[in-house]
Amino acid sequence: MSVKPLIILPDPVLRQVSKPVERFDDQLRKFASDMFDTMYDAPGIGLAAIQVGEPIRMLVIDLAKEGEPKAPHIFVNPTIVQSSDKRSTYEEGCLSIPDYYAEVERPATVKVNYFDADGKPQSMEADGLMATCLQHEIDHLNGVLFIDHISKLKRDMVIKKFKKLASQRASKKVL
């Protein structure tokens, strides 16, 4: 088990656009396993590679509830190829923005093309929480955070709070 440190707002790494994965090998599968370990440890239901400092287009999701068998999904180079006009709203949070939640409206259903960890092309049609989670994590791969979907006033308040916390953490390290 290898838990990676999470990148936390306001770290500019979170705004990077991730590069496509070109090699599907044991190293990629090991990294996916580490991502699951990190996500489960946090705990969370989704994690993009950029959130652990790797700017590659890969994400992991597991929506299994506590007490249910794990249901891990690996998405490499995912692309939303279709989304519904119908919208749904979910309260979202993010491992990179701890303890902050906000309602975000997104397309209710999406179709995503992606590769599995072995490089085999896959496609998934998703609705509900899976659709929301896929859009949230794919946003990360494009340098977009869920707070970018809320009002500027709320977003600015969140960023200010996390900049202050980062400054406090940095000053403690200096001591």
UniProtKB/Swiss-Prot annotation:
Chain sites annotated for binding Fe cation: 94, 136, 140
EC number: 3.5.1.88
Database matches in Gene3D superfamilies: Peptide deformylase (3.90.45.10)
Catalytic activity: N-terminal N-formyl-L-methionyl-[peptide] + H2O = N-terminal L-methionyl-[peptide] + formate
CDD domains according to UniProt: Pep_deformylase (cd00487)
Keyword Protein biosynthesis: yes
Cofactor binding comment, as recorded: Binds 1 Fe(2+) ion.
Keyword Hydrolase annotated: yes
GO terms of biological process kind: co-translational protein modification; translation
Family as reported in the entry's similarity comment: Belongs to the polypeptide deformylase family.
Function field: Removes the formyl group from the N-terminal Met of newly synthesized proteins. Requires at least a dipeptide for an efficient rate of reaction. N-terminal L-methionine is a prerequisite for activity but the enzyme has broad specificity at other positions.
Protein name: Peptide deformylase
Source species: Brucella melitensis biotype 1 (strain ATCC 23456 / CCUG 17765 / NCTC 10094 / 16M)
